[in-house]
């Protein structure tokens, strides 16, 4: 397989922000709708842009709810974000082997930078496409197409890695190969229904898929 470019989603793929996201949603929703939302209820909100989620809940309060969410999220970011096993070493190895690495996320750039700095992944990526950079978020192909242009990469030589069906669909729409991650909070079986080309049990599985020997 001739893959020289790897694009990653951020949340739930490279860094474990599940607790942070869930607590941010629960804090926000309980503020406006006390005791109406549970942890299970907000799992469906993980992945899409905040604006899409809050518009479906309360179109009149979208900006206010986003502000409440982000204030809590930023205040608790470093305490609640965790690392996934083998991610750092795998990304470092791919970087050292000369793969072109990018991130495609539906987060705003400020929060993306917080996560990358905290996990010390920030030096490995030549291109980071955030919600601030696009008109259409995943599953639209625009974010991936922008990353490909940024990295001067071809879709047929690129692998998109993500924990959400939006990542898999965006990759398919843009013509890349796709890999799901089995540690997705929505469940391996759910992600498998979108038929990614590969399913990673841990991030280091990428190395064997790509024929790369670790350091």
From Swiss-Prot:
One Pfam family, short name: HAD_2
Enzyme Commission identifier(s): 3.6.1.1
A cellular-component GO term for this protein: cytosol
Enzyme class: hydrolase
Alphabetically ordered keywords of this record: Hydrolase, Magnesium
Keyword hit for Hydrolase: yes
Swiss-Prot/TrEMBL GO biological process terms: DNA repair
Active site residues of this protein: 9
Catalytic reaction equation(s): diphosphate + H2O = 2 phosphate + H(+)
Cofactor: Mg(2+)
GO molecular function: inorganic diphosphate phosphatase activity; magnesium ion binding; phosphoglycolate phosphatase activity
Function of the molecule: Hydrolyzes pyrophosphate formed during P-Ser-HPr dephosphorylation by HPrK/P. Might play a role in controlling the intracellular pyrophosphate pool.
Family indicated by similarity: Belongs to the HAD-like hydrolase superfamily. PpaX family.
HAMAP family, sorted: Pyrophosphat_PpaX (MF_01250)
Record PANTHER family: PHOSPHOGLYCOLATE PHOSPHATASE (PTHR43434), PYROPHOSPHATASE PPAX (PTHR43434:SF26)
Protein name, per record: Pyrophosphatase PpaX
Phylogenetic lineage: Bacteria, Bacillati, Bacillota, Bacilli, Bacillales
Gene (name only): ppaX
């Amino acid at each position: 397989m001739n893959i020289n470019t790897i694009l990653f989603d951020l949340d739930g793929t490279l860094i474990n922000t599940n607790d942070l996201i869930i607590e941010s949603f629960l804090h926000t929703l309980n503020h406006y709708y006390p005791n109406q939302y549970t942890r299970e209820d907000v799992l469906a909100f993980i992945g899409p842009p905040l604006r899409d989620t809050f518009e479906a809940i309360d179109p009149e309060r979208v900006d206010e709810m986003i502000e409440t969410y982000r204030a809590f999220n930023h205040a608790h970011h470093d305490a609640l974000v965790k690392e996934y096993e083998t991610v750092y070493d795998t990304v470092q190895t791919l970087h050292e082997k000369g793969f072109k690495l990018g991130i495609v996320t539906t987060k705003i750039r400020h929060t993306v930078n917080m996560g990358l700095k905290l996990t010390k992944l920030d030096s490995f990526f030549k291109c980071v496409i955030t919600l601030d950079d696009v008109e259409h978020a995943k599953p639209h192909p625009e974010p991936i197409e922008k990353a490909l242009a940024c990295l001067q990469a071809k879709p047929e030589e690129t692998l998109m890695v993500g924990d959400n069906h939006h990542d898999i669909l965006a990759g398919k729409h843009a013509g890349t190969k796709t890999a799901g991650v089995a540690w997705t909070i929505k469940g391996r079986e759910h992600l498998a229904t979108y038929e990614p080309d590969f399913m990673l049990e841990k991030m280091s599985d990428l190395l064997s898929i790509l024929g790369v020997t670790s350091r």
